[in-house]
């Protein structure tokens, strides 16, 4: 039996319609059904499928057995600077004295006994100077309690902060001396500091003493740049024939504007 052309065209259109209809029906077990993307999932929480079943953890959170998370290397100050969590103290100030850790390097430079333990007194003023303390002394003890570190010094000054006087044991030129530190109201607590903040990549101005971050914070917000003490203002104008206030440094007009 021969089919007419119109019949063939009609059969073709019917087949196409059946295929389109089949593609729109989600048959059970069909591999054609699409799996919706999981919603945003909190880090570490299981991914849940459309029926509420757990589908596993995010790949980024899966760790191998024995694998540990890397420790946080540092803290940040309020302005984003790098601050090591266990940064060391570099100096302490108390009643006009400035105390430094007595390192082996300093003992050798100052020709002090290598077994001497205490804190180097770098500067004295105010009540510390009145007590007889001198720059170059080594503070050994406060009220008989040894102070081998700046942290220990702060602890011992905390004990006597409400007192009006305390005894200081110091080493000076091979002898141990006892001095009395006094204040009319109270002695207060020693204030400690770390080494100053340095810029990333700064050139080391001293012998190697371990990682820079043991003592320094890294950043740009910890000090004024340039240092105000290092700023030299231009010389002001002077009158012709004025008396020279300093030694001869060459023609006055080289530095000063001359007012007639």
UniProtKB/Swiss-Prot annotation:
InterPro entries: MCR (IPR040963), PDZ (IPR001478), PDZ_sf (IPR036034)
Entry's transmembrane regions: 8-21
Segments on the Cytoplasmic face: 1-7
Entry's EC annotation: 1.-.-.-
Topology of the protein relative to the lipid bilayer: Single-pass membrane protein
pH dependence per the UniProt record: Optimum pH is 9.0 for oxidation of Fe(2+).
Signal peptide residue numbers: none
Localization: Cell inner membrane
GO molecular function list: metal ion binding; oxidoreductase activity
Residues covered by region (PDZ): 86-194
Short motif (MCR (magnetochrome) 1): ranges: 195-218
Gene3D superfamilies linked to this entry: 2.30.42.60
Modification after translation, per record: Subject to proteolytic cleavage which requires both MamE and MamO.
Physiological role: Oxidizes Fe(2+) at alkaline pH; successively forms ferrihydrite (Fe(3+)(2)O(3) 0.5 H(2)O) then magnetite (Fe(3)O(4)) from an Fe(2+) solution.
NCBIfam families per the UniProt record, alphabetical: MamP
Domain notes: The dimer forms a pocket of about 8 X 15 Angstroms, lined with acidic residues, which may bind 2 Fe(2+) ions.
Further remarks about this protein from its record: This bacteria has on average 17 elongated cubo-octahedral shaped magnetosome with a size of 64 X 57 nm which contain membrane-bound crystals of magnetite (Fe(3)O(4)).
SUBUNIT field: Exists in a homodimer-homotetramer equilibrium.
Family: Belongs to the magnetosome MamP family.
Official protein name in the record: Multi-heme protein MamP
């Amino acid at each position: 039996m021969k089919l007419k052309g119109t019949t063939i065209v009609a059969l073709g259109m019917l087949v196409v319609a059946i295929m389109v209809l089949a593609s729109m029906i989600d048959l059970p077990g069909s591999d054609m059904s699409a799996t919706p993307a999981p919603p945003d999932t909190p880090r570490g929480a299981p991914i849940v499928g459309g029926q509420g079943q757990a589908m596993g953890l995010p790949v980024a959170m899966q760790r191998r057995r024995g694998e540990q998370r890397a420790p946080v290397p540092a803290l940040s100050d309020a302005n984003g600077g790098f601050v090591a969590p266990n940064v060391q103290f570099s100096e302490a100030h108390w009643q006009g004295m400035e105390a430094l850790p007595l390192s082996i390097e300093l003992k050798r430079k100052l020709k002090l006994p290598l077994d001497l333990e205490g804190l180097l007194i770098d500067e004295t003023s105010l009540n510390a100077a009145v007590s007889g303390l001198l720059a170059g002394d080594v503070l050994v003890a406060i009220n008989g309690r040894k102070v081998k570190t700046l942290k220990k010094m702060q602890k011992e000054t905390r004990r006597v902060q409400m007192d009006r006087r305390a005894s200081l044991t110091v080493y000076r030129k091979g002898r141990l001396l006892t001095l009395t530190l006094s204040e009319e109201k109270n002695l207060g607590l020693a204030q400690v500091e770390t080494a100053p903040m340095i810029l990333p990549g700064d050139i080391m101005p001293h012998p190697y003493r371990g990682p820079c971050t043991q003592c320094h914070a890294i950043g740009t917000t910890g000090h004024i740049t340039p240092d105000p003490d290092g700023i030299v203002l231009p010389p002001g104008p002077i009158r012709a024939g004025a008396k020279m206030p300093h030694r001869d440094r060459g023609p006055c007009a080289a530095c000063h504007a001359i007012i007639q």
